[in-house]
UniProtKB/Swiss-Prot annotation:
GO terms for biological process: ATP synthesis coupled electron transport. Keywords: Cell inner membrane, Cell membrane, Membrane, NAD, Quinone, Translocase, Transmembrane, Transmembrane helix, Transport, Ubiquinone. It is a multi-pass membrane protein. It holds the Pfam family Oxidored_q2. The lineage of its organism: Bacteria, Pseudomonadati, Pseudomonadota, Gammaproteobacteria, Pseudomonadales. The chain crosses the membrane at residues 6-26, 30-50, 62-82. This is NADH-quinone oxidoreductase subunit K. The keyword Cell membrane applies. It is found in: Cell inner membrane. Its EC number is 7.1.1.-. Belongs to the complex I subunit 4L family. GO terms for molecular function: NADH:ubiquinone reductase (non-electrogenic) activity; quinone binding.
Length: 102
């Protein structure tokens, strides 16, 4: 089995990133916004892996680990904010967050 060509891997990463960006802009539910952010971060991680494999450098794998670590931190903080938003307003609508003042 051969390696995936650079163009194909970057095209898939670009499509995933665009899908995540569209989901980020269109959705009003904070859970879907978080999922769209995860898709975007995984697309960038895929681009790093594909580029690292193309030039036979371990830098892509190192950046992949960094991106996955950042995605885990973002998910945990985002879910904590989601829970607090739901407890306070009983909705997951992101526009309700504009009412939070403190």
């Amino acid at each position: 089995m051969g390696a995936i060509p650079l163009e194909h891997g970057l095209a898939v990463a670009g499509i995933l990133f665009c899908l995540g960006l569209v989901g980020l802009m269109v959705r009003r539910n904070i859970l879907f916004v978080l999922m769209s952010l995860e898709v975007m971060m995984n697309a960038s991680a895929l681009a790093f892996i594909v580029a690292g494999a193309r030039w036979v450098q371990p830098d892509g794998q190192v950046m992949f680990i960094l991106v996955i670590s950042l995605a885990a931190a973002e998910a945990s903080i985002g879910l904590a904010i989601l829970l607090q938003l739901y407890r306070r307003f009983h909705t997951l609508d992101i526009d309700a967050a504009s009412e939070m003042r403190g």
